[in-house]
Amino acid sequence: MLRLLAIETSCDETAVAVVEADAAWPTFAPRQLSSVVASQIDLHAAYGGVVPEVAARRHVETLPFVLESALQQAGLGMAEVDAVAVTCAPGLVGSLLVGLMAAKTLALLYNKPLIGVHHLEGHLFSGFLAAADLRPPCLGLLVSGGHTSLIWMKDYGEYQTMGRTRDDAAGEAFDKVARLLGLGYPGGPQIDRWAQQGDPDRFPLPEGKLDHPYDTSFSGLKTAVLRLVQQLQQEGQELPVADIAASFQACLTRVLTEKAVACAEALGLSTLLVTGGVAANRELRARLLEAGRQKGLRVVIPPPNLCTDNAAMIGAAGLCHWLRGETSPLELGVASRLTLEEIPALYGQGSGGCGQAPTGAAAAVF
């Protein structure tokens, strides 16, 4: 049994988790022993969005307590943990550095391997926590505040981006439209809540047609909502917030569903994995599950607490790399941008003297 401590501080959640998996391959079924998340939503709400410097400072203040809580919940000490995983890219540089410095310190103090993890790969691995029988190949629809991508997971650690946003990410579009409607931050849950009471067919909105079949563009949709709001205000009408929210949400979720299903079919894949904060949206989940039922496509959507940023998903990805004999050097840095295809750059000679491959059953794989 391998146990791993994971740290996630890429944006405005301070998260630590302990996960474990059997030292067997390729049967990979990670389990979380603990997962603690300290959110900064209330802190940033006054600014209408995440302030990087404020986020980094709060991580510094909060991380020691979150770390202690995660270990207590797991009933383990650092001596009983086999490795330390940490998000190192992409994200806010200041926030990433807080988590990375903590992870390096623990790795050095307790002589543990260090495993850097790509944040988006972590989101994909939330699916393996939610469905123990999930195996690649599969298509990942990753929808969050900063990313909207269709990712072909060919194998563990082997990815090809099939589609991406040309402008606003889905979560970013939710936040901006919520701001236009005066609904506050974060916008996703607000739009979701108001849309339940609205008519999704009242306002036809543009879907943003592109020449690339799997890319998305939501800037036109956002602008259409802006013009609609301005027109209604100029006419002296009270804003039908619920109907606008429902119309916007229906348009965006329809686009995501159609592109994801079309891509999965084109690749001949039988499983669609949906992750990221926007995957917590009720209408998106319902549309995707219904589309999967109609097309004979298995749709795996983790529970909402695994869709939003958390450290358990980072730990799951870290365990996979650890089982594959991949660790990071202690010189590992952070990056605000890094594609999934660049993930191999995170693993080199290993974390000094403590970056050794697993023994026993896991070692036999390599």
Curated annotation (Swiss-Prot):
Its main location: cytoplasm. The lineage of its organism: Bacteria, Bacillati, Cyanobacteriota, Cyanophyceae, Synechococcales. Substrate binds at L142, V143, S144, G145, G146, D175, G188, D192, N281. It is found in: Cytoplasm. It comes from Synechococcus sp. (strain JA-3-3Ab) (Cyanobacteria bacterium Yellowstone A-Prime). Keywords: Acyltransferase, Cytoplasm, Iron, Metal-binding, Transferase, tRNA processing. GO terms for molecular function: iron ion binding; N(6)-L-threonylcarbamoyladenine synthase activity. Its EC number is 2.3.1.234. GO terms for cellular component: cytoplasm. The keyword S-adenosyl-L-methionine does not apply. It catalyses: L-threonylcarbamoyladenylate + adenosine(37) in tRNA = N(6)-L-threonylcarbamoyladenosine(37) in tRNA + AMP + H(+). PANTHER family: TRNA N6-ADENOSINE THREONYLCARBAMOYLTRANSFERASE (PTHR11735), TRNA N6-ADENOSINE THREONYLCARBAMOYLTRANSFERASE, MITOCHONDRIAL (PTHR11735:SF6). Required for the formation of a threonylcarbamoyl group on adenosine at position 37 (t(6)A37) in tRNAs that read codons beginning with adenine. Is involved in the transfer of the threonylcarbamoyl moiety of threonylcarbamoyl-AMP (TC-AMP) to the N6 group of A37, together with TsaE and TsaB. TsaD likely plays a direct catalytic role in this reaction. This is tRNA N6-adenosine threonylcarbamoyltransferase. Fe cation binds at H119, H123, D309. Belongs to the KAE1 / TsaD family. GO terms for biological process: tRNA threonylcarbamoyladenosine modification. It holds the Pfam family TsaD. Its cofactor is Fe(2+). Binds 1 Fe(2+) ion per subunit. Gene3D superfamilies: 3.30.420.40.
